[in-house]
Swiss-Prot record:
InterPro entries: Cop_transporter. GO terms for molecular function: copper ion transmembrane transporter activity; transmembrane transporter binding. This is Protein P80. It is found in: Late endosome membrane. Belongs to the SLC31A transporter family. The gene is p80. PANTHER family: COPPER TRANSPORT PROTEIN-RELATED, SOLUTE CARRIER FAMILY 31 COPPER TRANSPORTERS. Keywords: Endocytosis, Endosome, Membrane, Phagocytosis, Signal, Transmembrane, Transmembrane helix. One of its GO terms (cellular component) is phagocytic cup. It is a single-pass membrane protein. It comes from Dictyostelium discoideum (Social amoeba). GO terms for biological process: phagocytosis; response to bacterium.
Length: 530
């Protein structure tokens, strides 16, 4: 019993290496003192604003975000968290996109970021602007009224309301606009005041229809416009490669290199889906003969497969072998659940030697842009915390392997050491169980006394005798099942082909046999009376 207790103690100690201490979630516990310096991630802010604008694209915050992107401004009223605050504090706080903001900046919050929100002074609500537009257009037909006959995606309320009030600033319905654009407010002094508080200058040349005009050499297609085109593409085909790339770039808060919006747009419009409506501006601007320098600076991803090539690769892999991720792309054509680039990449990171992964190997070449970018961990080299163990049917070293269960994957040296000792002691337990069964079988061996006590049944069919059914048969069956389970479990561990885990099994069996093997030669004591 002391030996068994000791083994159980060591197994518990080994398993405890997997416990990880959690951290305070400042979104749900914003009053916790440790949350003072918490910063709500930019990727989450962008996702929340996109959530709001996906539901109501005519909201003022959508226009403000686009204008700030065009001016490449991220401070003051253009700070993304301040833009989110414009909606969640004053306009549409009940929308789902505001859920995290409201929790983070709830009453009693100690998060300093909440006190730095630079909301637009006297910004009218969406419905107040809409009401003023309808009132103005009912009194007088003006340019812009045709865009807001109904409140939908074509009715950009802030732009239309500002256009009407710039034309007729003394109208009573423009009182809200006058307050918003007052010289003492932060809108008038911001980089986005042009077109909202002051007339926007008209460009001398239309570089979309005349991209070969010398004056278009320095023309820059704004990030906001490029993002709008990408959104157009992804609304039609959300499984496209560019949609995944944009998500990854947003998560890393990267807007340069392959993550530049114009470069992401180029990935689709130059190589993948040039015929889609979202590529019309790109194709005009970068047509043959264009002098626009931005077109020559597109940093497209080298050897990026097309959406349909990726899907074909996924189908071929999953037809040969069922792997994690295949269930997302089970149909005969891509769907919204089939995010082809991440799925294809995860399959190839797990089985890089498959022939279907030739495109992935080229795309993730160490000399390519994707491999050397900030988003490489999503598609080429996953971090240890997120990496999928590679199935290698040959002896190998390393710590990243599945051990019996999908959730048992050591990702640190400490976790791997704990796994090694857990397997080692389990192998010792296996030898102990075999020894215990051997001892019991010898103690239960029928003898002369059993025959005299009628504990044996004579059988002409078997030409001998056998014991009656007793509780011993139940114990024998249970011990046999335990022994079989242990032996198969250890066999499966050895079949990971991980050298260290293989020798954990061998070492455990060796030590267990040394400790308990001799007891298998146990002979029950025989007295004179037996």
């Amino acid at each position: 019993m002391k030996v068994i207790s000791g083994l159980l103690f060591f197994i518990l100690i080994s398993c405890s290496l997997f416990l990880v201490q959690g951290q305070v979630d400042c979104v749900t516990n914003s009053s916790d003192a440790s949350c003072t310096n918490f910063q709500y991630p930019l990727a989450n802010i962008t996702a929340d604003i996109n959530n709001l604008c996906g539901s109501m694209p005519y909201m003022p915050v959508c226009t403000i975000q686009q204008s700030c992107n065009q001016e490449s401004s991220t401070s003051g009223i253009c700070d993304p968290f301040s833009i989110l605050g414009d909606s969640c504090l004053h306009d549409m706080p009940g929308m789902s996109g505001c859920n995290n903001f409201k929790k983070l900046c709830a009453s009693g919050s100690v998060v300093e970021q909440c006190s730095t929100v630079d909301s637009v002074t006297d910004l009218p609500t969406t419905m107040k602007m809409w009401a003023n537009i309808k009132s103005i257009c009912n009194e007088m037909t003006m340019t812009g009224c045709e865009k807001c006959t109904i409140l939908n995606a074509t009715c950009d309320v802030l732009t239309v309301y500002s256009t009407l009030c710039l034309a007729m600033p003394e109208m009573g319905q423009c009182a809200n606009w006058t307050q918003m654009c007052a010289s003492s407010g932060n809108m008038a002094s911001s980089p986005i005041s042009s077109g909202i508080c002051t007339d926007e200058p008209t460009p001398a040349t239309d570089c979309f229809t005349n991209p070969s005009d010398p004056s278009c050499a320095d023309y820059v297609y704004t990030a906001a416009n490029a993002n709008a085109d990408i959104l157009n593409l992804c609304k039609s085909m959300p499984y496209m490669t560019v949609c995944s790339i944009q998500k990854s770039c947003n998560q890393e808060s990267s807007t340069s290199g392959i993550c530049a919006p114009f470069s992401i747009l180029g990935d689709s419009c130059l190589h993948d889906m040039p015929g889609m409506n979202g590529c019309s501006n790109f194709k005009k601007l970068c047509a043959s003969g264009s002098v626009v320098e931005q077109c020559s600076s597109v940093d497209s991803i080298s050897n990026l497969p097309t959406t349909m090539q990726l899907f074909a690769g996924i189908k071929s892999i999953c037809t040969e072998m069922a792997m994690d991720g295949c269930e997302k792309c089970s149909g005969n054509s891509p769907t919204t659940t089939c995010d082809v680039l991440p799925v294809y990449s995860s399959l190839c990171m797990a089985m890089p030697d498959m022939s279907q992964c030739a495109n992935w190997t080229k795309m993730c070449s160490s000399s390519g842009q994707l491999y050397n970018s900030q988003i490489t961990s999503d598609y080429c080299v996953a971090s240890v915390a997120d990496a999928v163990p590679i199935m290698r049917m040959y002896f190998h070293t390393g710590i990243l392997d599945y051990i019996l269960f999908k959730s048992w994957v050591p990702r640190t040296d400490r976790q791997f050491a704990g796994s090694w000792f857990a397997i080692f002691f389990f192998a010792i337990f296996f030898e102990l169980e075999k020894t215990l069964r051997s001892i019991l079988e010898k103690r239960w061996t029928p003898n002369k006394k059993d025959s005299e006590d009628n504990n044996l049944i004579n059988s002409s069919f078997l030409s001998g005798s056998y014991p009656k059914f007793s509780y011993r048969d139940i114990i024998r069956g249970c011990l046999h099942a335990i022994e079989l389970t242990c032996s198969y479990a250890l066999m499966l561990v050895a079949m990971t082909f991980n050298v260290a885990l293989f020798f954990a099994v061998i070492a455990g069996v060796l030590v267990g046999n040394i400790l308990f093997g001799r007891y298998r030669n146990y002979t029950p004591r025989v007295t004179c009376c037996e």
